[in-house]
Each structure stands twice: as structure tokens, then as C-alpha cells.
């Protein structure tokens, strides 16, 4: 049986799986899937085009099963001790492994095993959860969190305190996705499998989930669950039908132009290894 078939079958019986009852074949399939996610060979979601993604549900199921097959244990990062089922990505890394990986991880940066970080990315004191994929040249700034199975594109900037939602709890059907060359402003939250399409700029303090109305003030269109490519988005509100109150929304104020790009450009000086 293929990895996928083993995982799919085991997931149907997940309630009966424990660290002591898991079949050796299932355990190895789960661990191999996590290894492939960790190396970037496998992704929870694969891009087909702008705004178009294929979700590998079985890989997400393997992430969930990994919590069923392992006991908590004491983990040590050299400074602190933890009690968890998932070791950190860098727990056993040598200097050569860091050099070969080609990204920077500053003190305070935490990535869990099963996450992937590509070359020239920068991890400030931040958190990257299991199953996440951080692509080349991305900046994960201070106190930003990349949730389980989230997909972060090339040259994305996640500003300080940004939250990118995961899929494990509450259980989501699709991962949250930030496509290539996007800028997410400080303290913004993108969650519930929402997609920010290529080249978009999200201002600070914008909150987007599946039910958030995203209003294009130029066309009057309302989007939900996705930000169209090249959008500049700020927080706003829309009036109720009777005019008695307003509710939060995100507003597309314009399309990205040269002025916007100049303000949000990637600094290559920070990424050279």
C-alpha cells in the first residue's frame, strides 16, 4: 500500500489508535509523511495557479495522526525544557545542516518538526507549526505565528505579531494560504483557510476569516475567503441594511502600484547567507 492509502485507512480508525496500539506499518507511514513535510518534499497544499490550490488531505490527516501515535516526552532546546509530542525542527541539527538549509533562525525562533523553511527565509523570534511551509525569501517577523499546515509563499513578509491560522483546532478543511510577494501588516490575522492571493498588501490590524466581507470600494464587489491578487486592503466597516449599526469588514482600497511596492519591498541585505 502507498503512504496515502495507509494514512487514509488508519484515519478512519483514529479513535482506536494510541502509542501502544498503533500498527508498526501505520506508525512508519505517519513518521515518513512528517519527514517528507519537514524536508519540503511533500506539502499539505500545492499551488496550481493564482488563487488555485490542491489540498493533500491525506498529508493533513498524517499530521493529526502523529499526535495519536506519540507520547509526551521531555524536550530540551538547550535553554528550556518542554513536555510535548512534537520535537523542534532544529533539535538535532548540526552547523552543516543549518548551512545547507540556507535560512536564518534567530534566538527565540521556534519551528516544529514537520514544518519546512526554504532558503533565504528569515525566522525572527516567531513560531512555525507542524505541517507549515515557508517558501524562499519569506520573512517571519517578531512574534508572528505560522499555524499548522499554513502555506507561506516566496518573498512574503509577515510583520510583527501577525497570526496565520492553522487547521488542527478548530479543525479546518483547507489551510490558510499567503501567496508569493504578499505583505501582511503588523498584528493582522488571516485564518480559517482564507487565501491572500499573489502580490497583495494587507495593512496592519486587518482580520480576515472565511466569513469576513472583503469590500472592493472601486467595483462594489464583495469577496469572502479570498483577497484578489494585487489588492491593497485595510480594515473598515459596512452599514447594516437598516442603517442602525455597522459591522467590521476588510476594504480593498486600490490595487498595488509602484508607490505601494516601494513601501513594502523585500530587503535583500537581510537574506544573504
Curated annotation (Swiss-Prot):
EC numbers on record: 2.3.1.117
Catalytic activity field: (S)-2,3,4,5-tetrahydrodipicolinate + succinyl-CoA + H2O = (S)-2-succinylamino-6-oxoheptanedioate + CoA
Record flagged with keyword Amino-acid biosynthesis: yes
Keywords, in A-Z order: Acyltransferase, Amino-acid biosynthesis, Cytoplasm, Diaminopimelate biosynthesis, Lysine biosynthesis, Repeat, Transferase
A GO MF term: 2,3,4,5-tetrahydropyridine-2,6-dicarboxylate N-succinyltransferase activity
Domain of life: Bacteria
Gene Ontology CC entries for this record: cytoplasm
UniProt: substrate binding residues: 104, 141
Gene3D superfamilies xref list: Hexapeptide repeat proteins, Tetrahydrodipicolinate-N-succinyltransferase, N-terminal domain
Gene Ontology BP annotations: diaminopimelate biosynthetic process; lysine biosynthetic process via diaminopimelate
NCBIfam families: dapD, PRK11830.1
Subunit structure as annotated in this protein's UniProt entry: Homotrimer.
Protein name: 2,3,4,5-tetrahydropyridine-2,6-dicarboxylate N-succinyltransferase
Native organism: Neisseria gonorrhoeae (strain ATCC 700825 / FA 1090)
Primary gene name: dapD
Amino acid at each position: 500500500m502507498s503512504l496515502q492509502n495507509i494514512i487514509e485507512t488508519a484515519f478512519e480508525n483514529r479513535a482506536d489508535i494510541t502509542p501502544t496500539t498503533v500498527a508498526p506499518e501505520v506508525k512508519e507511514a505517519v513518521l515518513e509523511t512528517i519527514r517528507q513535510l519537514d524536508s519540503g518534499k511533500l506539502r499539505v497544499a500545492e499551488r496550481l495557479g493564482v488563487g488555485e490550490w490542491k489540498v493533500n488531505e491525506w498529508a493533513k490527516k498524517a499530521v493529526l495522526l502523529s499526535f495519536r501515535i506519540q507520547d509526551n516526552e521531555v524536550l530540551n532546546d538547550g535553554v528550556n525544557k518542554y513536555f510535548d509530542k512534537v520535537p523542534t525542527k532544529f533539535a538535532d541539527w548540526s552547523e552543516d545542516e543549518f548551512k545547507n538549509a540556507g535560512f536564518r533562525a534567530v534566538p527565540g525562533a521556534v519551528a516544529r518538526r514537520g514544518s519546512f523553511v526554504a532558503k533565504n527565509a528569515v525566522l525572527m523570534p516567531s513560531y512555525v507549526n507542524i505541517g507549515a511551509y515557508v517558501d524562499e525569501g519569506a520573512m517571519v517577523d517578531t512574534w508572528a505565528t505560522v499555524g499548522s499546515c499554513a502555506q507561506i509563499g516566496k518573498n512574503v513578509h509577515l510583520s510583527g505579531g501577525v497570526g496565520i491560522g492553522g487547521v488542527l483546532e478548530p479543525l479546518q478543511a483547507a489551510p490558510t494560504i499567503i501567496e508569493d510577494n504578499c505583505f501582511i501588516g503588523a498584528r493582522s490575522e488571516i485564518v480559517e483557510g482564507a487565501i491572500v492571493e499573489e502580490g497583495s498588501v494587507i495593512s496592519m490590524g486587518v482580520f480576515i476569516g472565511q466569513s469576513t466581507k472583503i469590500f472592493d470600494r472601486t467595483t462594489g464587489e464583495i469577496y469572502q475567503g479570498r483577497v484578489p491578487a494585487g489588492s491593497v486592503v485595510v480594515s473598515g466597516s459596512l452599514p447594516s441594511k437598516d442603517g442602525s449599526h455597522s459591522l467590521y469588514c476588510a476594504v480593498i482600497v486600490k490595487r498595488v502600484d509602484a508607490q505601494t511596492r516601494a513601501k513594502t519591498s523585500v530587503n535583500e541585505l537581510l537574506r544573504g547567507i
